Amino acid sequence: MLENMPKVIYFNVTTSLPQGFYLRIPGKECSRGDYIVYEPSEEVKTLIIKNGWGDGERDFLKKVGAVAGEKYSVDAKTLRFEIEGKYIGQVYETDNKGNALPKLRGEFEVPEGYLLPIATSARSFDGRYVGVISEKRVKARVIPILTW
C-alpha cells in the first residue's frame, strides 16, 4: 500500500546543494531560486554510468537558475558560467577523475517549457554542462527542512 504514496521527504547526500532533508511542496510551476527534484535525460544517465558517478537511476536535486526567456552563457575562453550577466561559477573541462565533461559554450536563452538547473557547488553536474531540462521532467518542488 505504501508504494502508491507520493514521496514527501527527499534526502540529499551529494555536495551539489546542502546535504540534508528536503520537503515536497505543492505545485510544479517553477520560479528562479526554487529547489526541484527532476529526472535527468537519458543522455545524462548514460554519461553518469559511463563516468562511474552512479547507476543513472537517481533523480537530481538542483535549484532553478533560469526560466523561459532568461539568458545564460559559458565563455569559451574563460569558462565563466553566467546567468543574466551575473557570474555563477566556473565550468571545468574534466571531472575529479579526469573524465571529459560535456562542452556547452556560447550564449543561450531558455525556451518556453524549459528551465536551467544549477547547484551551489562548483563541481556539480548541472546546467552549465548540459543546458536546460524540460519542465515535464520535474517531479517535485522542495524546500530544505534540515541541512548541514
Where do the model's predicted regions map?
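Mid-length scaffold segments of soluble, non-membrane domains
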Residues: 55-90
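Phosphate-binding glycine-rich loops and adjacent basic patches that engage nucleotide phosphates
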Residues: 26-28, 72, 81, 100-105
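Surface loops and adjacent helix of pleckstrin homology
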Residues: 27, 41, 76-77, 84-86, ...
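Loop/helix-junction capping segments adjacent to catalytic residues or to phosphate/diphosphate-binding pockets
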Residues: 30, 82, 124
